[in-house]
């Protein structure tokens, strides 16, 4: 797919995500082709149309800017705005975020136990789903209290702040005073790009199978450090993601498959290629795959 095709697909997916998938791919594609992939302008014009057509007192709470005249008068935009009515307390925030060109997103960890594959993705906050690149199955994120990786610690005893490999809920000794400290959060890979910020300390924790175990250890616990996992012949996945059961409303967006390290355009091309392959397989098999 050419670069302009990638830009068109990105704009279609972003426009659809702004309105939580309520704009069909066909309508979004037509609008993006008509207005040069300007998802920001079209999104704001749709919000303006909703505000003008709604007529309720609630519409006064929606801060909608006056769009360009060609978009304001466009019948396709007006039709989409009409289809999104009525304005309610529940969808007011969606329209306001679309007006502000915002798509709330979060960085989440995913893990496929079948492939022993772990990855991070920035996903839309309202629909946290990602696909394993190896088996192509879709998964929910790893629960927040089960995440593992590079963790951030704040020692309550000596006030020392440090980083180290851990799983949420498993204590590690403070490098300053040795006091057992629980991690406050797991950091996405991009947080560790700056080599100067990496810890110079050798990993050590209280897990029973840690390669550099600190005593007293905690029986029945497992070390999250890759070296311990490899040394003990354990899988990379400490806690698997649950398979995603589709409700039919998931919007495949550039955010939903946007890697934290990889190039965005490459990922969208890869995502489109995978979708084409899935469609071909469905045709060959005579129906959709489970």
Swiss-Prot record:
Biased composition (Acidic residues): 272-290
UniProt motif Nuclear export signal: location: 261-269
Subcellular localization, as worded in the UniProt entry: Cytoplasm; Nucleus; Cytoplasm, P-body
Main location: cytoplasm
GO CC, any one term: nucleoplasm
Motif range (Nuclear localization signal): 121-137
Superkingdom classification of source: Eukaryota
InterPro entries for this protein: SHFL
Keywords: Antiviral defense, Cytoplasm, Nucleus, RNA-binding
Residue numbers spanned by region Disordered: 51-71, 221-242, 269-290
Region (Interaction with PABPC1): 102-150
GO MF entry, a single one: sequence-specific mRNA binding
Pfam families associated with the record: UPF0515
Biological processes annotated in GO: defense response to virus; negative regulation of translational frameshifting; negative regulation of viral genome replication; regulation of translational termination; response to interferon-beta; response to type I interferon; response to type II interferon; response to type III interferon
Assembly: Interacts with PABPC1. Found in a complex with PABPC1 and LARP1. Interacts with ELAV1, MOV10 and UPF1; the interactions increase in presence of RNA. Binds to ribosomes. Interacts with GSPT1.
Family: Belongs to the SHFL family.
Biological role: Inhibits programmed -1 ribosomal frameshifting (-1PRF) of a variety of mRNAs from viruses and cellular genes. Interacts with the -1PRF signal of target mRNA and translating ribosomes and causes premature translation termination at the frameshifting site. May exhibit antiviral activity.
Protein name: Shiftless antiviral inhibitor of ribosomal frameshifting protein homolog
Organism taxonomic ancestry: Eukaryota, Metazoa, Chordata, Craniata, Vertebrata
Gene: Shfl
């Amino acid at each position: 797919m050419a670069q302009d095709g990638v830009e068109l697909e990105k704009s279609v997916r972003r426009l659809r995500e702004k309105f939580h998938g309520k704009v069909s791919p066909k309508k979004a594609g037509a609008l993006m082709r008509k207005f040069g992939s300007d998802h920001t302008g079209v999104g704001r014009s749709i919000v303006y149309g909703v505000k003008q057509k709604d007529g309720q007192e609630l519409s006064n709470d929606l801060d909608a800017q006056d769009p360009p005249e060609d978009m304001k008068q466009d019948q396709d935009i007006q039709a989409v705005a009409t289809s999104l009515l009525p304005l309610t307390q529940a969808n007011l925030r969606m329209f306001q975020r679309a007006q502000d060109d915002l798509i709330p997103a979060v960085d989440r960890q995913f893990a496929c136990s079948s492939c022993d594959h772990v990855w991070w993705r920035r996903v839309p906050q309202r629909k946290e789903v990602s696909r394993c690149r190896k088996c192509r199955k879709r998964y929910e994120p790893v629960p927040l209290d089960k995440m593992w990786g590079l963790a951030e610690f704040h020692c309550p005893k000596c006030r020392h702040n440090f980083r180290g490999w851990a799983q949420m809920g498993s204590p590690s000794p403070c490098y300053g005073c040795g006091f057992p400290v629980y991690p406050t959060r797991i950091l996405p890979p991009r947080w560790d790009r700056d080599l100067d910020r990496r810890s110079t300390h050798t990993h050590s924790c209280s897990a029973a199978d840690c390669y550099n175990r600190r005593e007293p250890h905690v029986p029945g616990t497992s070390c999250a450090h890759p070296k311990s996992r490899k040394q003990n012949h354990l899988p990379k996945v400490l806690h698997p993601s649950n398979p995603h059961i589709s409700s039919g409303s998931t919007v495949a967006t550039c955010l939903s498959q946007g890697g934290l390290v990889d190039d965005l355009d490459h990922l969208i091309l890869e995502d489109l290629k995978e979708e084409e392959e899935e469609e071909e397989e469905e045709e060959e098999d005579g129906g959709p795959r489970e």
